[in-house]
């Protein structure tokens, strides 16, 4: 599995209340959530993001409230994966459960800049910064997590395995 896109970069401690503000949690409509993704820290995010783009954060990305609305909003906005130095554990699990690819890589988080073009090889854990001609190494997912992400989430993975 690979992803390629331009980077939307944010800092440390990007919490779920910033990813999708609480005032929008009264909807389960994924497109509506995506329409408000990141608006409190990047009002033009929805206008700038293109399908396949990549989000990069710093330490503790996705901290705060335990809500799966946050990774849903990111995924539905068109982001193909999130790279960060570290993730809040509940955000990490929620992301995998809804099929949003995420990778922890401190070096990539620090060296990648906003608007860099990046290609991610999930099978080998390689993050290539095309703009800077640099490659960073992340720990690839084990096979069972790859299966969940490739199935577009945990529920689909379970449905597909029952054949």
UniProtKB/Swiss-Prot annotation:
SUPFAM superfamilies: LeuD/IlvD-like
Pfam families: Aconitase_C (PF00694)
EC number: 4.2.1.33
Keyword annotations: Amino-acid biosynthesis, Branched-chain amino acid biosynthesis, Leucine biosynthesis, Lyase
Superkingdom in the source lineage: Bacteria
Gene Ontology biological process terms, A to Z: L-leucine biosynthetic process
Keyword Lyase: yes
Subunit (UniProt): Heterodimer of LeuC and LeuD.
Protein family membership: Belongs to the LeuD family. LeuD type 2 subfamily.
Record-given protein name: 3-isopropylmalate dehydratase small subunit
Organism: Brachyspira hyodysenteriae (strain ATCC 49526 / WA1)
